[in-house]
């Protein structure tokens, strides 16, 4: 049996200690005394019992509720007790230590969810989605994680595996009864079905870019020369006054990093120092950091002042974004414009959007949101996030499964025989099973759950 704090550590109204495994009720009963005097093992499943946490000497540590969930009707499919105390740091630590003295051991990272997976309550994709739900930063990210948790992604994988297994069964039947002479018809049907499954895999792989961004965020650098409105843009995207805004160039000397919800997409925004030549040592460090962030960023928002002619500093910004995924923003369009979007467009490729905005009046921000959304969802359909590929491992497994299916088609075209086709199909079937956890190795399972927090 294992135990851990299941709520964020710190001060709060409620803190939860979770205990799971054989004799979980016995362990909880050693640290919890019910107000009604009845042993906790007599409590019914999904009943909350009021009482107190007590130490070895019978001294009260805190008042608490014990929530009992008996196997198999619990998160882990094991007996589970959740001790709900007050959310003080010392209270939770003391209670946790008492559960260890009572026979539990400290839970490893993600061990509760790992047990739910090993006990068949969740498949691997659904288990991974638990952490994604916890870390979701936008409603769209949450919808994607919830879709995985409720099996929308897995359903498609199970369907493909079922169809592949059906093809394998037909091949094996044809091998066992060769007198039927259906090889040509069978291989034609198999090739047609394999092509259809490969198309589905290709569709899933198209979602990998958007899925990764919705899960991890899009690293976005805001760059421009000093006093062009970078901090004002950050504040507008965050909908709060996060960065200091003044008319003094060089106010932002270091980089500011924040997450913003832009059209449901989590942007990990870095507001950089204004890029210019400077003798100020501190500002120069900030400028160098800004240049390094430009290299790392997946998206660059480059700001230019519409009310002033382009100068050498603006030319430097244009050089930095050349060949990068960027959106050019012409700020201060509420003032008398000197630079137009058409003038700025001449300096970059046609596919680089140029948007006129005003961080003072918020004009153009909706168009910016649409441009970012279009970049993220390119080739995919918004509203289907529950079936998106969400991480690099899933994408790689799908690519490898597709390679096995492509090999099956080559085998058919080379007329190499049913045995060889079956080998390729079975390899694809096993590879797809790694997504749901049905054919995955223990090392991969351990790696996935090691990224979870303790208590989940």
Which residue ranges define each predicted feature?
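A glycine-rich (often HGG/GG-containing) alpha/beta subdomain
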Residues: 1-143, 147, 151, 327
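Inter-motif core of Ras-like GTPase G domains
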Residues: 283-307
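Glycine-rich, N-terminal phosphate-binding loop of Rossmann-like dinucleotide-binding domains
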Residues: 19, 85-87, 237, 272, ...
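Switch I (G2) and immediately adjacent beta-strands of P-loop GTPase domains
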Residues: 50-62, 66-70, 250-278, 296-299, ...
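Conserved beta-strand segments of alpha/beta enzyme cores
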Residues: 105, 266-268, 353
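C-terminal-of-GTPase-core extension/linker across diverse P-loop GTPases
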Residues: 1-5, 9, 51, 139-261, ...
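Short alpha-helix of the ABC ATPase nucleotide-binding domain corresponding to the H-loop/switch region
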Residues: 249, 275, 283-287
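Alpha-helical scaffold elements adjacent to nucleotide-binding pockets in ATP/GTP-utilizing enzyme cores
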Residues: 98, 293-296, 316-317, 371
């Amino acid at each position: 049996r294992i135990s851990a704090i299941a709520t964020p550590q710190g001060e709060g109204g409620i803190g939860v200690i979770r205990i799971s495994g054989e004799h979980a009720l016995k362990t909880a009963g050693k640290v919890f005394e019910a107000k009604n005097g009845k042993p906790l093992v007599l409590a019914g499943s999904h009943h909350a019992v009021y009482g107190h946490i007590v130490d070895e000497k019978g001294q009260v540590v805190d008042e608490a509720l014990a929530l009992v969930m008996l196997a198999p009707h619990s998160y882990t499919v094991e007996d589970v007790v959740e001790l709900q105390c007050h959310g003080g740091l010392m209270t939770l630590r003391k209670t946790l230590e008492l559960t260890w003295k009572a026979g539990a051991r400290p839970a490893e990272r993600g061990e509760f969810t790992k047990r739910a997976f090993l006990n068949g309550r969740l498949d691997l994709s659904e288990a991974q989605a638990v952490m994604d739900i916890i870390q979701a930063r936008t409603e769209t990210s949450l919808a994607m994680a919830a879709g995985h948790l409720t099996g929308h992604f897995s359903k498609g994988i199970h369907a493909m595996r079922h169809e592949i297994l059906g093809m394998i069964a037909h091949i094996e039947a044809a091998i066992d009864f060769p007198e039927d002479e259906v090889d040509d018809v069978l291989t034609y049907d198999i090739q047609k079905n394999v092509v259809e499954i490969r198309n589905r895999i290709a569709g899933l792989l198209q979602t990998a870019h958007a899925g990764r961004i919705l899960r991890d965020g899009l690293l976005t650098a805001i760059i421009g020369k000093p006093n062009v409105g970078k901090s004002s843009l950050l504040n507008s995207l965050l909908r709060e006054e996060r960065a200091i805004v003044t008319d003094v160039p060089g106010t932002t000397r270091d980089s500011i990093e924040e997450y913003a919800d832009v059209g449901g997409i989590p942007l990990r925004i870095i507001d950089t120092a204004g890029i210019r030549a400077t003798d100020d040592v501190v500002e120069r460090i900030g400028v160098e950091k800004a240049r390094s962030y430009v290299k790392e960023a997946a998206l660059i928002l480059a700001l230019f002042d519409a009310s002033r002619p382009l100068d050498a500093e603006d030319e430097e910004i244009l050089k930095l974004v050349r060949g990068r995924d960027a959106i050019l923003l012409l700020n201060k369009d509420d003032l008398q414009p000197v630079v137009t979007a058409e003038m700025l467009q001449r300096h970059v490729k046609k596919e680089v959007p140029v948007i006129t905005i005003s961080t003072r009046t918020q004009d153009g921000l909706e168009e910016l949101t649409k441009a970012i959304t279009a970049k993220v969802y390119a080739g995919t359909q918004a509203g289907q996030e529950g079936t998106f590929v969400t991480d690099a491992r899933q994408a790689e497994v799908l690519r490898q499964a597709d390679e096995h299916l492509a090999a099956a088609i080559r085998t058919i075209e080379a007329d190499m025989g049913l045995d060889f086709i079956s080998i390729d199909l079975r390899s694809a079937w096993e590879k797809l099973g790694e997504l749901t956890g049905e054919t995955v190795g223990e090392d991969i399972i351990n790696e996935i759950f090691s990224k979870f927090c303790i208590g989940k």
